[in-house]
Amino acid sequence: MWALRSLLRPLGLRTMSQGSARRPRPSKDPLRHLRTREKRGPGPGGPNTVYLQVVAAGGRDAGAALYVFSEYNRYLFNCGEGVQRLMQEHKLKVARLDNIFLTRMHWSNVGGLCGMILTLKETGLPKCVLSGPPQLEKYLEAIKIFSGPLKGIELAVRPHSAPEYKDETMTVYQVPIHSERRCGKQQPSQSPRTSPNRLSPKQSSDSGSAENGQCPPEDSSAGANRKAWGRDPSLVVAFVCKLHLRKGNFLVLKAKELGLPVGTAAIAPIIAAVKDGKSITYEGREIAAEELCTPPDPGLVFIVVECPDEGFILPICENDTFKRYQAEADAPVALVVHIAPESVLIDSRYQQWMERFGPDTQHLILNENCPSVHNLRSHKIQTQLSLIHPDIFPQLTSFYSKEEGSTLSVPTVRGECLLKYQLRPKREWQRDTTLDCNTDEFIAEALELPSFQESVEEYRKNVQENPAPAEKRSQYPEIVFLGTGSAIPMKIRNVSSTLVNLSPDKSVLLDCGEGTFGQLCRHYGQQIDRVLCSLTAVFVSHLHADHHTGLLNILLQREHALASLGKPFQPLLVVAPTQLRAWLQQYHNHCQEILHHVSMIPAKCLQKGAEVSNTTLERLISLLLETCDLEEFQTCLVRHCKHAFGCALVHSSGWKVVYSGDTMPCEALVQMGKDATLLIHEATLEDGLEEEAVEKTHSTTSQAINVGMRMNAEFIMLNHFSQRYAKIPLFSPDFNEKVGIAFDHMKVCFGDFPTVPKLIPPLKALFAGDIEEMVERREKRELRLVRAALLTQQADSPEDREPQQKRAHTDEPHSPQSKKESVANTLGARV
């Protein structure tokens, strides 16, 4: 492996898939399902198979999301944080999603939309249509603040006032619903606050009725008359989805019995007629359609409705569209999906409204009272890691609402991840794909791995013989790695986030990628509110989506936690590039009031030598240091995108933690982090991919380790691994007793420094199969490059061609075996 790499260096060639040596990607063709759709043409008839599947069951850590499948189309209803990760883990194809329906402009509904759109763009999907509140268009514009131009995918918004949508599977009608509380008292998370310490919302012409205190008109056209772009928390959009009628099947055997010309061209118009329900006349006989065709499958209806609070109950109950379907016998409602808290479900008005759909309608409930494991692979790997060290790798838990579930008189099912309701071919609930988090099976699987138990026993013996020094055994600071993967959330590793617990009641969050709150829920379970209340500051290193799109949910959930525990609200200190302000402002203007949650400190103001003339900023910086008990909170620009920062936290007790963010090896980071107690450095790529690392402005494992050595860091934790290393990265020869690798939900303190490097042998045993596959892939890539290098060298040496041609005439032909030996000898000589 290393010999192959050394062969390439004197030839001046790149190893593996580096830089310009990589084959350029071919231009993306239309996706296969789009080509199939074009061939099929219009009017294929209703689909044979249609089902709804729960992606997220409405829990606090996952939100509520539904996936709808037919052989023609795929749909997604709501896209909160973590939905993309769940779809990837459970093999629900993202590439087929050309329609996303959103019930309201709330972070629990749209928090994962940015990442989802970027992924759809990468798959080559040419167009995606989003239906829901009109503010969607402004939300998409806001996303471009940090995503850049979304070239390659057309994003269209279908506001609730648009006509019905129709495709090969169904017709979808949008039903706008306005809360009766829209002029009254707002919910806590929507109530404006003012403070000189906080970002002040700008009054703009597009700020909607909530900004100027004007109440919208009370007539039925209120939604259409209010300003299209302003924040409107009183609006939700329900969706009534009617499947196309599926024609009956032609009975071939019956047709033969009746003497019809089966197998000839003459049968085609007969089939078309009877499938349309028309009788035919053949050789003087009239034959009814029912004799030759099974009954058609009616166009069933399903409804998705969100009722966030009691203020929406009366508008829902009095809505004329729902009344029509409650009385419609020709279009039976098979299923109603209720995204509603228990406070709504126990209301007698809402229960009576549910009952009016009749006894044949099923009801699916999605809310916080739906206990369901979603991230099964994360639970599995954490259970197996805990066999090695249960303190460093604690078992995951879950947050469940303590509120009792309502007793309802209608046929009701509580949501759980991957639960299906099939509409065609047969109406039924299907639980064969739901998740079973069986920890005993996970443990048994690990214990059966070759040498795993032996390596764990050897590791424990080694740790007992070499305990941590007494001065390092303090519990704090405690580092909890919440997301250790790069780019996009995946089933094993979530995107960037690290919690630094400074003390039992103070903590700092270093980056906050999508799904950070969900990771906190799974790590702390019922203690999540306490943890959120202890959060004193967040550092955002740069504005790539995998580093900051979890921030809004942290802010909203933190306010909920403070209220739940009866603690006074204070804005959260956020150290970030100033460009984050524009994103927060846009979201505040068009979705939810958020600015009162934040006291922002520009990261550039914490650079060494930076002058801060603003007295408000001076006070915020002093508050940051005082609240976190820090002597210094310093930042520096790093080598990644524009406005990317690393940071160093120096505690009053003397320890120093340095966080690189995303960067190539950076001298400014080395200088800022001199003599760090702990360096947390990104190691996105394996050794040998140095030029790819330059292209993507990241570091390899050895580069990250070298930064720590030059910094004289006491210990180095590597994280932010490419998702190609799903479970474990490839190890570098530079790994030593001062280096550890991070996993999601890994928890370390300074006293664990001697222990963490000793984890590597049992980790290698646990992931031996994965490591072997990665090594094989690397060696194959390198061997291909070696062969290409030899061919290139021969082609570039014209003076050698004539002797080679002469030898070709005199040498005896080589057997296949001798050719292999010749190549091997050549490689050996080069090495």
Curated annotation (Swiss-Prot):
Designated name of the protein = Zinc phosphodiesterase ELAC protein 2
Q: Which GO terms describe its biological process?
A: mitochondrial tRNA 3'-end processing
- Subunit architecture: Homodimer. Interacts with PTCD1.
Phosphoserine modification sites are S191, S195, S200, S204, S732, S797, S815
Family according to the record: Belongs to the RNase Z family.
Catalysed reaction per UniProt?
Endonucleolytic cleavage of RNA, removing extra 3' nucleotides from tRNA precursor, generating 3' termini of tRNAs. A 3'-hydroxy group is left at the tRNA terminus and a 5'-phosphoryl group is left at the trailer molecule
Lineage top rank: taxon: Eukaryota
CDD domains per record: RNaseZ_ELAC1_ELAC2-C-term-like_MBL-fold, RNaseZ_ELAC2-N-term-like_MBL-fold
- UniProt-annotated stretches for the region Disordered: 15-47, 179-227, 791-831
A GO molecular function held by the record: 3'-tRNA processing endoribonuclease activity
- Natural source organism: Mus musculus (Mouse)
Q: Which residues carry this modification: Phosphothreonine?
A: T792
Which cofactors are named for this entry? Zn(2+)
